[in-house]
Amino acid sequence: MPRGEAPGPGRRGAKDEALGEESGERWSPEFHLQRKLADSSHSEQQDRNRVSEELIMVVQEMKKYFPSERRNKPSTLDALNYALRCVHSVQANSEFFQILSQNGAPQADVSMYSLEELATIASEHTSKNTDTFVAVFSFLSGRLVHISEQAALILNRKKDVLASSHFVDLLAPQDMRVFYAHTARAQLPFWNNWTQRAARYECAPVKPFFCRIRGGEDRKQEKCHSPFRIIPYLIHVHHPAQPELESEPCCLTVVEKIHSGYEAPRIPVNKRIFTTTHTPGCVFLEVDEKAVPLLGYLPQDLIGTSILSYLHPEDRSLMVAIHQKVLKYAGHPPFEHSPIRFCTQNGDYIILDSSWSSFVNPWSRKISFIIGRHKVRTSPLNEDVFATKIKKMNDNDKDITELQEQIYKLLLQPVHVSVSSGYGSLGSSGSQEQLVSIASSSEASGHRVEETKAEQMTLQQVYASVNKIKNLGQQLYIESMTKSSFKPVTGTRTEPNGGGECKTFTSFHQTLKNNSVYTEPCEDLRNDEHSPSYQQINCIDSVIRYLKSYNIPALKRKCISCTNTTSSSSEEDKQNHKADDVQALQAGLQIPAIPKSEMPTNGRSIDTGGGAPQILSTAMLSLGSGISQCGYSSTIVHVPPPETARDATLFCEPWTLNMQPAPLTSEEFKHVGLTAAVLSAHTQKEEQNYVDKFREKILSSPYSSYLQQESRSKAKYSYFQGDSTSKQTRSAGCRKGKHKRKKLPEPPDSSSSNTGSGPRRGAHQNAQPCCPSAASSPHTSSPTFPPAAMVPSQAPYLVPAFPLPAATSPGREYAAPGTAPEGLHGLPLSEGLQPYPAFPFPYLDTFMTVFLPDPPVCPLLSPSFLPCPFLGATASSAISPSMSSAMSPTLDPPPSVTSQRREEEKWEAQSEGHPFITSRSSSPLQLNLLQEEMPRPSESPDQMRRNTCPQTEYCVTGNNGSESSPATTGALSTGSPPRENPSHPTASALSTGSPPMKNPSHPTASALSTGSPPMKNPSHPTASTLSMGLPPSRTPSHPTATVLSTGSPPSESPSRTGSAASGSSDSSIYLTSSVYSSKISQNGQQSQDVQKKETFPNVAEEPIWRMIRQTPERILMTYQVPERVKEVVLKEDLEKLESMRQQQPQFSHGQKEELAKVYNWIQSQTVTQEIDIQACVTCENEDSADGAATSCGQVLVEDSC
């Protein structure tokens, strides 16, 4: 195309079309979307950069608040994690408080306070201390509801700023966790807890805690924190302006600023003491709050850190030596060591004098923690311990770590010292190896608890681990010490096949093996699912340590050991011990061995007679074992207990009589064991002491004036004699005892079935034992014999009560088995306790009359093992002649023996005039039995009665041995009211507090009754009845029969010449030289002088030395008092008075003249009418003045002689 041509329209259209397309794309939606995306991406990038910058700034800010314990610079991740933990803690606490506000404690338990009341409370507390302010913040919002005005001055902040801020914002970041932990709403006490009783039990008071609170107004002072002591309380605040709003739970805090203890006001030097606790790895566990003003550290600053890092580098090595000594003296009291230098918060060092102790884990036997008690010796250079630290400690982490490892490995060693822990009474390091053999408490789990329960230690294994119980004496001591919780169960068991072998087991092992009542506490412990506490472990450890440390000296005689201990080496030794034990038992008792066929199996007799059960507790059966202290010997008589639980329970089953009598042969009476020579040699010193005291009692006669005064009180004599005589008897007969016993009350309602007597050759029917049931006595739990099983101890000697032969009277039948006493078949044999054989029926009458002042036929157990008041008589080791004569076929005594007995009876009747002249009953050794060891087969039952109880024979037969007559019979009653005898006016009744005894049918009935009410006595030819603690019984009478009743109910004796005698636990029959009776009844039957002359005509007139002079030498033995001639005695007294006359003060001549002017009778040398009285002062009636003066004169003459 040529140059000059104009463009064509085709080209211009194409260009315009291209421009239209571009403009269309620019205004299209897609274009706008792309443009928007580009712009948004650019803004997001800018936002990210901005957020990143802000985040970096926040992280840098959080790093400033990071806890100062970290020495290294915190990273961004650490700061974010710390911030996250803080956020979670705040959220958890706020949610917890909201939950409690809805479902927590009732709102009524917390008092409501208004803002005005809070201001009043704040002013009251802050006015006393200028460094204290009160702040109240809400649990829901965390903002301060109220703050006292002093807070602005103390914190150096404006009050408006404080009122609008959160309380947590004022705290240092490192103390927030402590603040939240101590302000949990569930733990806070109520502000008015002194008025809310329930609050004391629902919410325990919280200990004060320490926090640092920031002061200043700008950020430049944000690191200036001061320590404060905070005490939180719970209150509810309501707003009166907005009553529709509910009350708001709030925390009221009393905030007190802490100052350095070395600045004014300074803490006294003697009170700068604090305590710390650290682990074997030297890490602080607990720090006393007293350490805050002394060290400058808050408790949370030290807890969890090493104690070595605060010590001077040169003193760190001392901690190794200190912990070595801690290991050496583990469990002992605290010990002191070298002083150490401790760094305070400001960087200065203080010198501490420390004492150290430790606590030992009783399970692992390792030291759990160490307790240090520190006293500040020197103060730091900078007294402000809270000042900012300028100096830096030379921390060598490597050295500290090495020392910690060394000390930790040192304290890993177990402690073997058997002493208690020095950390109070929480635990002990005693001998717990086998008791807590489960390694350590950290390994305990559910499975481990089951194993511990299955492997529960028994008392046998504990004794085996202790390994200190070597002989029977120690075993007996342990039994006696623990008899309150474990009743000792001992007894004698004879095997049917073995025949006579005694097996010994301790009551501990026996009761733990069976299901007796004493194993209930052990079973409860085994069933307990909870692990024992420190207190329980310490208690058990104390018991074990006491058993280990207690050493009992060896006893004099070799005795067998417990079969559960390791003292016996083989079975042969055990058998030998058993055989020796049985031999020594029989030898020491001097009694014939009962044949094996007659011995009761399993501790009881064969039940053939029926009747009421006679129950004896298993604890009572153990009284036979132990060391006899009745005599003055150390003989050990141990009776083995039953082997199995069944045997132990058999002792408590009803016992009945063995109807087959046990025949005794003369070959069985062998003299082994304690003979006369052995006793005399062994008790020579005791004899001499007794004789000396006996002579002193006779010569001094301290009872003469007392008895003289008592004799004048006619109506009151019957009440006082029982008590006073018993005291005299107790002092005379028991003053040589080695142990004092507390008198226990006797069961007042103890009773038993009736016993009767009948013809000597009657039939045996309807056996009724004379022992009450256990339920009738309130003291069944104590080891006592039934009251009916023996005569009380205050009668000079004891015999058990036995059922009597059957008797048949008109209209009524009485039956009792004529066998041996049922109680003695199963009782354990002890020294002085002799089992009676089954005596033939014809001799039971004679056998029953043996008691009262004569030595006992069967003395019971030793008083040291019998707590009952009626078991205090002294045991005898020799067999009584009355027992041996019971087997005699001859009934008539030789004439020579009869005459000799008459002379002895006369002396013994006279000897009752003084409570100390009865040598037989007063001697604790009973030496008169040593002269009669061999039985005399020629003696008759009547002769045996005279041998054993001459006093009773004298009362029955009179002075010349003939039958009693109306002139010579009387009723001797001690401890019971007067007894009436209206049918005969001349019958005498010597009564002392005994109830009336009626004898309307015959005037010559005589009765010796001690503590027994009247007793009915129908007629029967020949019988003798012993009734002790029984219901009203009716016994036939005989002209020569004696009815012995002790503590029995009223009885009447309508027969002819029956007599009754009884003994009481409160008194004994002692007839003094000047006192014999008093007013007998309300009607006043007889005077005391007439009774004295009729009943004992030769006693009252003769002085005591004359009685002793007439005593046969055979009976008196070593108790002879030197003769005293009356003229010589009076002459010596006059000489003594003449020699004393010169030493007496005398009036001078002038004094005599002066007195003569005032008193005319001095000048005339006469006696005035006021003092010229012929009657006795103690007499009540003027009519009896002459007789009383004569009686008093006789008494004075007797005393002077």
Swiss-Prot record:
Region: 5 X 18 AA tandem repeats of S-[HP]-[AP]-T-[AT]-[GST]-[ATV]-L-S-[MT]-G-[LS]-P-P-[MRS]-[EKR]-[NST]-P, residue numbers: 965-1054
Keyword Metal-binding belongs to the record: no
Annotated stretches, region: CSNK1E binding domain: 555-760
Matching InterPro entries: PAS (IPR000014), PAS-like_dom_sf (IPR035965), PAS_fold_3 (IPR013655), Per1-3_PAS-A (IPR048814), Period_circadian-like_C (IPR022728), Period_circadian_regulator (IPR050760)
Motif (Nuclear export signal 1) on chain: 55-64
Sequence ranges assigned to domain PAC in this UniProt record: 337-380
UniProt feature, compositional bias: Basic residues: 733-743
Domain PAS per the UniProt entry, residue ranges: 121-188, 262-328
Comp. bias intervals (Polar residues): 721-731, 957-976, 983-994, 1001-1012, 1035-1050
Motif Nuclear export signal 2 mapped to chain: 925-932
Biased composition regions of type Basic and acidic residues, renumbered to the chain: 13-50, 900-911
Location of the motif Nuclear export signal 3: 403-412
Sequence repeat placement: 965-982, 983-1000, 1001-1018, 1019-1036, 1037-1054
PTM entry text: Phosphorylation by CSNK1E is weak and appears to require association with PER1 and translocation to the nucleus.
Start-end of Low complexity biased regions: 767-783, 881-890, 1053-1067
Molecular function (Gene Ontology), one example: transcription corepressor binding
Biological process terms in GO annotation: circadian regulation of gene expression; entrainment of circadian clock by photoperiod; negative regulation of transcription by RNA polymerase II; protein stabilization; regulation of circadian sleep/wake cycle, sleep
SUPFAM superfamilies cross-referenced by the UniProt entry: PYP-like sensor domain (PAS domain)
Region Disordered, annotated ranges: 1-50, 717-788, 881-923, 952-1067
Motif mapping: Nuclear localization signal: 729-745
Region described as CRY binding domain: spans on this chain: 1123-1201
Record-level GO cellular component terms: cytoplasm; nucleus
Disease: Advanced sleep phase syndrome, familial, 3: An autosomal dominant disorder characterized by very early sleep onset and offset. Individuals are 'morning larks' with a 4 hours advance of the sleep, temperature and melatonin rhythms.
Subunit structure: Homodimer. Component of the circadian core oscillator, which includes the CRY proteins, CLOCK or NPAS2, BMAL1 or BMAL2, CSNK1D and/or CSNK1E, TIMELESS and the PER proteins. Interacts directly with PER1, PER2, CRY1, CRY2, and TIMELESS; interaction with CRY1 and CRY2 is weak and not rhythmic. Interacts with FBXW11 and BTRC.
Protein's recorded name: Period circadian protein homolog 3
Biological source species: Homo sapiens
Encoding gene, per UniProt annotation: PER3
